[in-house]
Amino acid sequence: MATVEVATELGTVVTAVGPKAKDEEEEEEEEESLPPCETVRWAPVGAVAEAGPGAATFSEAAAAEEPGAAPGSPSDATVRTLRRLEAERRQLDSALLALSSHFAQVQFRLRQVVRGAPAEQQRLLRELEDFAFRGCPHVLGYEGLADPCGGDESDVLPGDRPRVRGEDQSEQEKRERLETQREKQKELILQLKTQLDDLETFAYQEGSYDSLPQSVVLERQRVIIDELIKKLDMNLNEDISSLSTEELRQRVDAAVAQIVNPVRVKEQLVEQLKTQIRDLEMFISFIQDEVGSPLQTGGHCECQASGKVGIGSTRVGGSTLPPGPGKAKAEDAKRARETGLHLMRRALAVLQIFTVSQLGCATGQIPQTLWQRSQADRDYSHLLKRLEVSVDRVKQLALRHQPHDHVITSANLQDLSLGGKDELTTVVRKELTVAVRDLLAHGLYASSSGMSLVMAPLACLLPVFSSAPETMHPWELFVKYYHAKNGRAYVESPARKLSQSFALPIMGDTAVTPKQSLLTAIHLVLTEHDPFKRSADSELKALVCMALNEQRLVSWVNLICKSGSLIEPHYQPWSYMAHTGFESALNLLSRLSSLKFSLPVDLAVRQLKNIKDAF
């Protein structure tokens, strides 16, 4: 029943309103159908239909107050109405512009959602929702905000007296309106910035914008600046707004100087120390050149050719002074001369063999035992077998005696006689070193001047061949390598001497190479054993013990094997060294590389040094 009553009331209202609206439409059509001359002129908007006595009085008073006004000029009410209409139109235009911009942003974000990746669509939809319900900003603001001092003249009635500007506005209201206007402007600026960032980001993602968006660039620059401020220990958050550009530059320079200046001071100190060390080395070299080594005694030169003075040396009273600055050139010339002599010796040997084979006058006089003995000497299998046995025995003893148990101190060595050494040291010195020595000595000989070309044709007249070439101890190979590489100059360099004097690490942080360690070891063995005239076997044993202690036996022997200037002139072509390059022996010795040894090095001269110290 209630529903029927409501429907009945609504129908009554519609029937009541319908004819009335219809009458108004008919009146408008009739007015539009009249010609323009017969249309009724409408009163201005806001004007009173009938002017009362108060209005006439006000008009007369206004005319009296404005004597210069023309009689046909529009009234103040009309002017105010036109101004209000213009203001409303501007407001509507600005609102329409803001609404259109808002719709354009919504369309732009919708396009981003459609073109975006599936993983990003949910986030873009949430951002679109927030933006759509945020509202559109008013571009020009309200009319009252645009002219805060103009007053609200639109509400003035035509019959009332116009109020003076600012009469109804206090200072507080003006300030409030200004603050409101500023807030609106800030919101507008913030929204425009956001829209600009979104547009740059979209253009950059689409590829139509080459550079990064300004927001991304500013963010990265801010990160860099924050890190620099943190590293430089600067506090600019408090007074950065009150400082000028020059003052900021000075503060940054001061902060950078606090970090850079200590580094520069250290670099200058290092350069000064390097200069002082270089000057000291030059001074030591100058003193060595001035003083020189003691003159050689005996009245003869220790050159290969007796009675001849080497290149770069000077004869003074039967003695030979050391070479001067041309020492390196003299050594190069000497090396070239030795190479030439070696080639000449080989050529002479080939010519001699050719002559003897062609003449054939002394072939019957060659003893057969000589060839048999030579063929027997060329076999090195038993030497390799002996080396393998000695390596295995040393390895077994080394594994049995752990490094912490096998430490021979000086106190224990003083109580030991030469025959009372431990078993591992004995095996290393008497078996392993001997096996290495014999294998290195296979086919090793000392280079000689050879037979003269004049004596070659007379070889057939000799009853037998000349004696075999002079043998050479393997230790002499290490000594020749030491001299060829200028080992004494390296070990006794001023820099190493200064480092030893000040207890500084000789090589610093750099690793010691096998070549440097070998030169140092040979120099140590020579300086300890030569004053006591020890044999080459003793010196080789000391070197092998030192190599085992430093785990460099394979690398040191390999350096000798790879030295062509030593191998070619001192080894026969059939020797084990020239035939195999000592490869299998190095493989056997490598079994000891992972073991740690602490063998005595100066065992052969320890008692002699103790006797010397006692006296």
From Swiss-Prot:
SMART domains documented for this protein: RUN
Coiled coil, from the record: 76-102, 163-238
Keywords: Coiled coil, Phosphoprotein
Compositionally biased tracts (Acidic residues): 24-33
Gene3D superfamilies: 1.20.58.900
Biased composition (Basic and acidic residues): 158-180
One biological process term in Gene Ontology: in utero embryonic development
Protein origin, superkingdom: Eukaryota
Residues bearing the modification Phosphoserine: S73, S499
Signal peptide residue numbers: none
Pfam families tied to this protein: RUN (PF02759)
Function text: May play a role as p53/TP53 inhibitor and thus may have oncogenic activity.
Name assigned to this protein: RUN domain-containing protein 1
